[in-house]
């Protein structure tokens, strides 16, 4: 848009140019996020996360809270140092490790009062309406993207390999 290029209709999205030019202060009502551990280095077998946030609150849906969350970070020296401290009795380190690896199904954070997302207020009366609104917005967005939640997560490897020739990732033994 900024380059005055004719944008093909097949491309989704909304121009950010009015915000850059100072004609608007807000781009969209919500920001959506998604993440998977399926097929990533040191990832859990399948731990999908979807999220939505507005200008104040963030809603996170962890599809498999009964599975330990793992990724490259959990194998890092920093994370291993937290584990070591936790095992030595450091209650703060123990709580950080637990919270990172064992996530509840639903998380809601008040980003104004809790910018580091430490106090999960999901299910509390004070945010019941907010939680329902954000949950509805996330489910509507997921539907618009063809995202079936855990079913989509379980099929993640198929999407990651799309367009690759068989054996393309195999290393050659030739010298």
Segments the model singles out, each with a brief description of its role:
Residues 5-107, 162, 166:
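C-terminal cap/loop subdomain of S1 sulfatases and analogous C-terminal strand-loop tails that border
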């Amino acid at each position: 848009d900024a380059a005055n290029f004719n944008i093909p209709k097949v491309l989704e999205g909304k121009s950010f140019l009015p915000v850059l030019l100072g004609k608007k202060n807000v781009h969209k009502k919500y920001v959506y996020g998604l993440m998977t551990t399926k097929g990533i280095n040191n990832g859990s077998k399948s731990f999908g996360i979807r999220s939505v946030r507005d200008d104040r609150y963030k809603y996170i849906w962890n599809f498999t809270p009964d599975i330990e969350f793992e990724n490259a970070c959990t194998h890092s020296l920093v994370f291993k140092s937290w584990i070591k401290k936790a095992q030595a009795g450091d209650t703060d380190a123990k709580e950080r490790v637990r919270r990172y690896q064992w996530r509840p199904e639903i998380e809601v954070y008040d980003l104004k009062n809790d910018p580091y997302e430490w106090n999960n207020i999901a299910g509390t009366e004070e945010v019941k309406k907010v939680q329902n609104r954000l949950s509805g917005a996330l489910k509507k967005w997921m539907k618009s993207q063809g995202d079936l939640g855990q079913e989509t997560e379980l099929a993640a490897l198929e999407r990651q390999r799309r367009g690759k020739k068989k054996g393309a990732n195999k290393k050659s033994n030739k010298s």
